[in-house]
Amino acid sequence: MIEQIVSEPQIKILNSFKHINLFLAGVGSGKTHLGGIKSYQLIKKYPLVRGFIAANTYLQLTQSTLFRMREYWKSIGVNEYNKDTKPSGQYVVNKKPPSCFRTDNHNFDDYYGIISFKNGCVIFTGSMDRAESHSGKEFGWAILDEVKDTEAEDIKEYILTRLRQQGIFVKDGKLSNSGDPFNPIYFLTSPAKEEWINEWFKLDQYIDEIASLIYSDKTYFYKEFDDKCI
């Protein structure tokens, strides 16, 4: 068994059954590591539910977000497939999957911007600086990394409206194959310049409480309200 170190704030997000989740933290806090954990949890349990992973820019996506997430996947034995050097690999990136992968649920002319897993799971990837390119996609879960500078309207129009594929459910406080439909989105980002994060999550209402907690390595701010988790 591979032992994984997870912080209390990360555990709160991992265990959240709110549809809209925010992990707001500084550099080195494990934001993208958290994304790696959550993404593979969903990939493994719901192989027929498509996911979406994005960052604010393409360079952020390729050089930071996916790099860190794939590092996590590798740490638990989930490697990229290569016919010659890693035939036991479990995913391919931007290419047609090999015949040993499940693809009966695929219907793509081109696999650019797609991560395909051996169990059939598909993850769309992209950047939010070309948000309109995600129009028409449909997925069941989403992870948005470092999108603090992304405009709120782009997220509402091109992401939240696409977050509607069925297949993930919550029952008795656990992920399930039946029960209440669940389409979670996770924002993993550092403090925002755009006001939409403060407004969506009502952070201005908790300024004093936040200030009293965030400057210690032993405490953190946590709140659930409506359909949101911070």
Residue ranges of model-derived segments:
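Phosphate/NTP-binding elements of NTP-utilizing enzymes
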Residues: 1-230
